[in-house]
């Protein structure tokens, strides 16, 4: 497995910065290319995927027809892209509506895409930054809400025999 070492790009991808900011739940934080919100998304998300995701609201289900309307993209092309976005873990989908129509959801990071990015071992091996992304997004949002949570992440608990 490749070791994760990250150097922020000199020219960050603007769409990835915007998407990272849209999804983050870190209170009062502006996402930069040095943040896990950036490097986690940047590893797997294309600019085209980011454009589509930016037309969605976090945790608000949308049908294919609604996303077609929001993006102006051709239905068949968009459906394939949404499937790819779901396969990498950026989106989730369900049929939890009265018509049982497939709907896509842009989740928050944890629980959500930070976890989904780590569900395929080959994806983690190819992009080890997603493991760091998940670990960081499990704790960073809590810093301003519950400062003690971050310090507890490094405790070693005794083994109970």
Question: What does each of the following model-derived ranges do?
Answer:
Residues 2-25:
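N-terminal basic/disordered segments at the start of proteins
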Residues 25-50:
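Short alpha-helical segments that sit at the start of domains
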Residues 53-54:
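Hydrophobic residues on short alpha-helical segments
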Residues 59-70:
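Short acidic, hydrophobic short linear motifs in intrinsically disordered regions
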Residues 73-84:
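Short amphipathic alpha-helical interaction segments
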Residues 86-96:
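A short, conserved structural fragment
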Residues 102-103, 108-137:
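Short, amphipathic alpha-helical interaction segments positioned at domain boundaries
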Residues 153-159:
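Conserved small/polar residues in nucleotide/adenosyl-binding loops
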């Amino acid at each position: 497995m490749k070791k994760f070492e990250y150097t922020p790009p000199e020219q960050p991808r603007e769409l990835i910065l915007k998407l990272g900011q849209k999804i983050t739940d870190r209170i009062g934080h502006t996402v930069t290319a040095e943040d896990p919100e950036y490097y986690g998304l940047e590893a797997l998300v294309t600019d085209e995927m980011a454009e589509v995701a930016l037309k969605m609201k976090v945790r608000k289900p949308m049908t294919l027809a609604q996303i077609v309307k929001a993006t102006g993209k051709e239905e068949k092309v968009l459906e394939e892209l949404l499937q790819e976005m779901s396969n990498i873990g950026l989106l989730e989908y369900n049929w939890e509506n009265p018509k049982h129509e497939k709907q896509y959801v842009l989740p928050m990071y944890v629980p959500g895409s930070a976890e989904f990015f780590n569900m395929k071992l080959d994806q983690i091996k190819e992009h080890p930054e997603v493991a760091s992304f998940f670990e960081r997004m499990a704790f960073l949002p809590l810093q301003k809400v519950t400062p003690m949570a971050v310090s507890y992440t490094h405790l070693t608990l005794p083994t109970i025999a």
